[in-house]
């Protein structure tokens, strides 16, 4: 992280909001427990790809960052009401969401996934007929599963506030599978041989930071993200948290337009 912040400090950046605004913290809401994006270490410190990214943006804008733990489904109301300035938590940009919130440019491309017990009867989407599956409330996994439940023959969708309770139910066989973002699940199961990510579901998702609709601060953050991409900070974060160099044409590297 020190190397990353050194790269940020080397950038020639600005503070369009003035000296008084520069002293105010940027309040960032995050669904802590959403590995590897934002989670708490044993000592209680918040870490993760998006925690590092939020702090890098704050460094670039010359403002401290305050992280607030909010369940995923509560992030939308929190940012709309002004309780927080930015929401992060592997939030997918969608046309539906753009009707009520704003986004900066994307910085990660993703897909959905099916996670199951490694030795269980369910090992594919085809095995979900008559089964109970879990999703995170209000997530794109929830949306995808709801749209496809009838075609897949899913008997019941159970909705959770965060990954931990869903994984407890999966391990105890109260649900037969869990549908969620693939990077989080691949990271989560890496040291859990009794669980397996068995399906990658292509959805063309892109993650970004979320703002209140029409908030001009989104333009400042968007430009900071552009500079961080140009400086290689986003690519370094990707390599740090995912163990791989992002593709040159990926949303992690390429400067992109804000979605409108």
Model-derived regions, located:
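Bacterial N-terminal signal peptides
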Residues: 6-16
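Extracytoplasmic small-molecule ligand-binding "clamshell" domains
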Residues: 23-90, 99, 221, 240
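Bilobed "Venus flytrap"/periplasmic-binding protein-like clamshell domains
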Residues: 27, 32-35, 44-59, 92, ...
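Periplasmic-binding protein-like
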Residues: 31-32, 108-116, 182, 186-226, ...
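Short helix-initiation/N-cap motifs at beta->coil->alpha
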Residues: 51, 66-77, 157-169, 205
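Extended ligand-binding regions for polar small-molecule ligands
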Residues: 51-60, 122, 126-132, 137-140, ...
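Ligand-binding clefts/hinges and TM-proximal coupling segments of bilobed small-molecule sensing domains
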Residues: 64, 140-158, 197-198, 229-260
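A ligand-binding cleft/hinge motif common to bilobed small-molecule-binding domains
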Residues: 74-77, 89-99, 146-147, 169-203
